[in-house]
Amino acid sequence: MWRTNQVSSRQNMAGFTLIEVLVAIAIFASLSVGAYQVLNQVQRSNEISAERTARLAELQRAMVIMDADFRQMALRQFRTDGEAPSEQILQWKESLLDSDQHGLLFVRLGWHNPQQQFPRGEVAKVGYRLFENRLERVWWRYPDTPAGQQGLISPLLTGVEDWAVQFYLQGEWSKEWVPTNALPEAVKVTLRLKDYGEIERIYLTGGGSLNMTQESVENAG
């Protein structure tokens, strides 16, 4: 009787079998892999969300800056590299500003300089170009610049495959800008982005025309 109880006690104290251990390990491994995949997906989703938020902020910032520039277009000639005043107060030309495509150049108002605290005027020369798939803003502290003075370059938007500008005047849109003494009533900017495709924005300007003779006299003075 005593031996039978001893054998039964030993059997009750026996541990897990090898198969049970392997099954437990397999289940634990499966749960670990599943948990890792879920965690990885959540982390990747957060990264994608952050990237898209940053991209939208970049796009919105570029649009706001362009809106401010176009709304403040000035009826004023400008000088580049110390040369005579430009014939056009708004230039839209191939390779202008070393652009990979067309470049845009004009003068803008509204750059406040209270009590002349900063080494610049309140009227600035501003340009836009497409360079290595980036939309860049090129600007100068003054509208009339001496020879050799380079503009300051501010990257606005990355991933730009193509860009185009159209000009609205007297009820018609034009892909070229011919008038020498006038500004368009509106500017349409079309951008083709790698991620968002083609987007289009229309910006109003002050419009108007300039007496070139009077402007030339004022610039000469």
UniProtKB/Swiss-Prot annotation:
Pfam families noted in UniProt: N_methyl (PF07963), T2SSJ (PF11612)
Gene3D superfamilies attached to this UniProt entry: GSPII I/J protein-like (3.10.610.10), gspk-gspi-gspj complex like domains (2.10.70.20)
Ranges in a coiled coil: none
Record's bilayer topology term: Single-pass membrane protein
Record flagged with keyword Membrane: yes
GO cellular component: plasma membrane; type II protein secretion system complex
Biological process according to GO: protein secretion by the type II secretion system
Subcellular location: Cell inner membrane
Keywords: Cell inner membrane, Cell membrane, Membrane, Methylation, Protein transport, Transmembrane, Transmembrane helix, Transport
Primary location class: membrane
Propeptide: 1-15
Family per record: Belongs to the GSP J family.
Subunit structure: Type II secretion is composed of four main components: the outer membrane complex, the inner membrane complex, the cytoplasmic secretion ATPase and the periplasm-spanning pseudopilus. Interacts with core component epsG.
Role noted for this protein: Component of the type II secretion system required for the energy-dependent secretion of extracellular factors such as proteases and toxins from the periplasm. Part of the pseudopilus tip complex that is critical for the recognition and binding of secretion substrates.
Name listed for the protein in its UniProt record: Type II secretion system protein J
The organism of origin for this protein: Vibrio cholerae serotype O1 (strain ATCC 39315 / El Tor Inaba N16961)
